[in-house]
Regions:
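Cleavable N-terminal export/targeting peptides
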Residues: 1-8
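Catalytic phosphate/metal-binding cores of nucleic-acid and nucleotide-processing enzymes, i.e., regions
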Residues: 9-134
Length: 134
């Protein structure tokens, strides 16, 4: 998908761009829901899942003692250090995708913010409140 600047003021003409950004926001919300479950409610993680990776009370040992493992290399070492950065990166990417490109009226930015909030919230509650419910 190529995003090009345009003078077209039709909000509906940008629906693909808004949908792509909303999708990234939903993924961000889902990642945040998983992250918060892992950090604050590890007892909600299914027993059949690998505790060494999912349970933050023991997964911190996965990082090792090297400087690399304690810094940027910790990404992917456990669920907390995978879904936390994924949440932040997809949140940023969604905001960029939604706002880049054409000039718009002021209320269209507000509508995009609302779509973003609803999408993020839906992703979050799908994981935190529904999938990992007690």
């Amino acid at each position: 998908m190529t995003i090009q600047a345009t003078d077209d003021f039709s909000y509906l003409s940008r629906w693909k761009q808004t949908a792509a950004g909303a999708g990234l926001m939903a993924v961000s919300g889902a990642c945040y829901g998983i992250h918060e479950t892992v950090v604050h409610h590890p007892n909600r993680i299914p027993a059949s899942w690998d505790k060494q990776w999912w349970d933050g009370r023991i997964s911190w040992k996965n990082k090792g003692s090297s400087t690399w493992g304690r810094t940027i290399g910790s990404f992917g070492s456990d669920a907390k250090h995978t879904f936390g950065p994924l949440h932040r990166h997809t949140l940023y990417a969604g905001a960029v995708v939604i706002t880049v490109g054409s000039r718009r009226r002021w209320w269209e930015y507000g509508l995009d913010a609302l779509v973003s909030f609803v999408s993020f919230s839906a992703g979050f509650h799908a994981t935190y409140s529904l999938y990992f419910r007690e």
